[in-house]
């Protein structure tokens, strides 16, 4: 299993028509974003005074992410992307 460092997040991209809250995203929006599930998160980042700021997302969250963000990786037969938390645009609430 992949364990990201810092503010990085491991995502499993959903390969289907994208909807947000039951609304189908327009074709142009689908080209700019993709829906993914958070698989793992790093521990967060440290502020200048040394405090740890935890990620805003957690494993199991569904998120909307920039389409071309991140690095494609494989772990066994599974494909994932690793992105910085800043590339996550929104958490999709049920």
Swiss-Prot record:
Q: Does the keyword Membrane apply?
A: no
The protein's location, in the record's own words, is: Cytoplasm
Instruction: Check the UniProt entry and state the signal peptide residues, or none.
Output: none
**Keywords assigned by UniProt?**
Chaperone, Cytoplasm
- Which Pfam families does the UniProt entry name for this protein? Cpn10 (PF00166)
A GO cellular component annotated for this chain's UniProt record is: cytoplasm
GO term, biological process aspect, one: chaperone cofactor-dependent protein refolding
Q: What GO molecular-function term can you cite, just one?
A: protein-folding chaperone binding
User: Which InterPro entries does the entry mention?
Assistant: Chaperonin_GroES, Chaperonin_GroES_sf, Chaprnonin_Cpn10_CS, GroES-like_sf
What does the function comment of this entry state?
Together with the chaperonin GroEL, plays an essential role in assisting protein folding. The GroEL-GroES system forms a nano-cage that allows encapsulation of the non-native substrate proteins and provides a physical environment optimized to promote and accelerate protein folding. GroES binds to the apical surface of the GroEL ring, thereby capping the opening of the GroEL channel.
Q: How does it assemble?
A: Heptamer of 7 subunits arranged in a ring. Interacts with the chaperonin GroEL.
Q: Family, per the entry? A: Belongs to the GroES chaperonin family.
Record's protein name: Co-chaperonin GroES
Q: Which organism is it from?
A: Streptococcus mitis
